[in-house]
């Protein structure tokens, strides 16, 4: 493991203590408090710029052009936190290189009944069955038009719950038409376990017309996000379809419905009910999926790896296993902004240790971590 400075250890101690206090409150209430705090960062431009200068890692070796977009740093916020693009300008200020906002649906919807968000501290994980609660594509588009920064953002779009599967193509097309040109890239989400029947759309015959419709509706790069619970054969099929349609890339992976190997007592997990688990428990499978995708289509499209990337060592392994970009959400909750900084500093240090000028040179290199 990489060593921490005394100052870094102190910040971690303070954050851990704060986290214990926050964890006495309901998860969604904490999310609301964080939203308000980040909303201040989003809305006050001088504060935003000052934080970005102080907190973010500025190293030219981390900057790369990906599908025609310049990403200043490789780690981005994963979809699920900023569902309505209400804090779109805050994410660069806390250190992320970009942010994927959403998931957004064509029509507004409340999501599933509460409680729908649960913590598994023993696993450094979160279980959620939020159900794509959001204000709808038209309202999110208004928020995006009010942005002041030029930070890189992607928009993750999903199916409106009440829309039947046979009308999914039109539903995704509507979202893409409203949001596509307001983002740097779009991600088609067919992999959340919390919308009935959504994962069935990962089947190639269902997925092809959806992806084609989204591509026709926007000029920005289009990617697809897949589940870790797909069989290897289905992963291959989606990858081949992505190549056939000339997608910009694949985001791998979403949350898992598996409950295997958890440290949290099974009775507690069962009491939480249905939902997808994110964080450390999905790390191993996410890495497996990444390696499989890179071997099959890595030379033909961008791979964004997400799922349990908690340490700089894990981040480096994802990069050297074929990921051009990384994402995280749950480790941000457990680690705070220093987690983002640690990841970026760790990658930059490894690039220097291996004599590489740019992160692009490390992608798929299989280079080991150097202490």
Swiss-Prot record:
It catalyses: (S)-dihydroorotate + a quinone = orotate + a quinol. SUPFAM superfamilies: FMN-linked oxidoreductases. Keywords: Cell membrane, Flavoprotein, FMN, Membrane, Oxidoreductase, Pyrimidine biosynthesis. One of its GO terms (biological process) is 'de novo' UMP biosynthetic process. Pathway: Pyrimidine metabolism; UMP biosynthesis via de novo pathway; orotate from (S)-dihydroorotate (quinone route): step 1/1. It is found in: Cell membrane. It is a peripheral membrane protein. Its EC number is 1.3.5.2. Binds 1 FMN per subunit. FMN binds at residues 79-83, 103, 156, 189, 225, 253, 279, 308, 329-330. Disulfide bonds: none annotated. Its main location: membrane. InterPro entries: Aldolase_TIM (IPR013785), DHO_dehydrogenase (IPR050074), Dihydroorotate_DH_2 (IPR005719), Dihydroorotate_DH_cat (IPR005720), Dihydroorotate_DH_CS (IPR001295). GO terms for molecular function: dihydroorotate dehydrogenase (quinone) activity. GO terms for cellular component: cytoplasm; plasma membrane. The active site is at residue 192. Substrate binds at residues 83, 128-132, 189, 194, 254-255. The keyword Glycoprotein does not apply. Pfam families: DHO_dh. Its cofactor is FMN. Catalyzes the conversion of dihydroorotate to orotate with quinone as electron acceptor. Belongs to the dihydroorotate dehydrogenase family. Type 2 subfamily. Monomer. NCBIfam families: PRK05286.2-1 (NF003648), PRK05286.2-5 (NF003652), pyrD_sub2 (TIGR01036). This is Dihydroorotate dehydrogenase (quinone). The gene is pyrD.
């Amino acid at each position: 493991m990489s060593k921490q400075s005394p100052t870094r250890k102190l910040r971690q101690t303070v954050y851990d203590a704060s986290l214990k206090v926050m964890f006495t409150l309901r998860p969604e209430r904490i999310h609301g408090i964080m939203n308000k705090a980040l909303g201040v960062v989003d809305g006050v431009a001088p504060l935003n710029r000052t934080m970005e200068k102080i907190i973010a890692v500025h190293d030219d070796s981390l900057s790369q052009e990906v599908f025609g977009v310049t990403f200043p740093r490789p780690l981005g916020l994963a979809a699920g936190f900023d569902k309505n693009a209400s804090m779109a300008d805050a994410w660069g200020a806390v250190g992320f290189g970009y942010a994927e906002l959403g998931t957004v649906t064509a029509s507004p919807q409340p999501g599933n009944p509460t409680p729908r968000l649960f913590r598994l501290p023993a696993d450094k994980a979160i279980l959620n069955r939020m159900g794509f609660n959001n204000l709808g594509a038209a309202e999110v588009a208004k928020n995006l038009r009010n942005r002041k920064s030029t930070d890189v953002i992607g928009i993750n779009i999903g199916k409106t719950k009440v829309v039947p599967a046979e009308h999914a193509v039109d539903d995704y097309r509507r979202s893409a038409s409203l949001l596509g040109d307001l983002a740097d890239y779009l991600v088609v989400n067919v992999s959340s376990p919390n919308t009935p029947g959504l994962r069935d759309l990962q089947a190639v015959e269902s997925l092809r017309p959806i992806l084609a419709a989204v591509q026709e509706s926007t000029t920005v790069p289009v990617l697809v996000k897949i589940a870790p619970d797909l069989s290897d054969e289905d992963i291959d099929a989606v990858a081949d379809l992505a190549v056939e349609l000339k997608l910009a890339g694949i985001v791998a992976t979403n949350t898992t419905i598996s409950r295997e190997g958890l440290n949290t007592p099974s009775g507690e997990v069962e009491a939480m009910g249905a939902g997808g688990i994110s964080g450390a428990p999905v790390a191993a499978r996410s890495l497996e999926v990444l390696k499989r995708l890179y071997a099959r289509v890595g030379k033909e499209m961008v791979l964004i790896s997400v799922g349990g990337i908690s340490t700089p060592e894990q981040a480096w392994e994802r990069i050297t296993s074929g990921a051009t970009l990384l994402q995280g959400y749950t480790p941000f909750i457990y680690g705070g902004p220093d987690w983002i900084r640690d990841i970026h500093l760790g990658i930059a240090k490894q690039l220097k240790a291996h004599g590489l000028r740019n992160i692009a040179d490390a992608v798929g290199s299989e280079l080991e971590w150097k202490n």
